UniProtKB/Swiss-Prot annotation:
Pfam families found in the cross-reference section: NTP_transf_3
Subcellular location: Cytoplasm
Gene: mobA
Assigned EC number: 2.7.7.77
Keyword tags: Cytoplasm, GTP-binding, Magnesium, Metal-binding, Molybdenum cofactor biosynthesis, Nucleotide-binding, Transferase
Superkingdom of the source species: Bacteria
Family statement: Belongs to the MobA family.
Source organism of the structure: Helicobacter pylori (strain P12)
Gene Ontology molecular functions: GTP binding; metal ion binding; molybdenum cofactor guanylyltransferase activity
SUPFAM superfamilies: Nucleotide-diphospho-sugar transferases
Protein name (record): Molybdenum cofactor guanylyltransferase
Amino acid sequence: MKNPIIDNIPCVLLAGGKSSRFTINNIQINKALMPLKSYSSLLEYQYTRLLKLFKQVIISAKKSYELNAPYLLEKESGLFSPLFGIHNAFLTLQTPYIFFIPIDAPLVSFESIKALCGIENFSVVYAKSPTKEHYLISLWHKSTLNALNYTLKTQNYRLSDLVKNTSSVAIHFNQEEEFLNLNTLKDYELAVQILKKRANG
């Protein structure tokens, strides 16, 4: 077993979302609990996978799940914004840098994550694929704390506004596929196919 490669930056898995577009037969499903590969849930898949790269992986969620893992609980029960999870992570973990990744981005390669974690001197280092910015697949520095405080106070939950008002940098990646977000059942089915294809060769 290789030693985890990144031991100076914790990884926070953002799992406090609403899954509002993830429906099966018009019933809203919590996508964190959808099975993936041989794992009982997307949550378990992501947590187990990221532990191969990071020494410390913590799940940010509204409530803890059955999965035995460290959790950061978001106290704002009725409000859904990843900014609460990011803000809470900095207040709790007290580390200069934290890498964030959403639970519903299971295809991001370790190479891409390492590239993002290898760049310092910016408040936010985020991934950009050919068609969009991925502000939540990103390395954040604690210098964003004041901006986060202000954003939450003024209730402007637009992530892009916050990131663009900090010293941020986009790292460009050519692969669209690895940044697939599992927003819908269709996205989930596509990810299952991609993972199958990867396993076969």
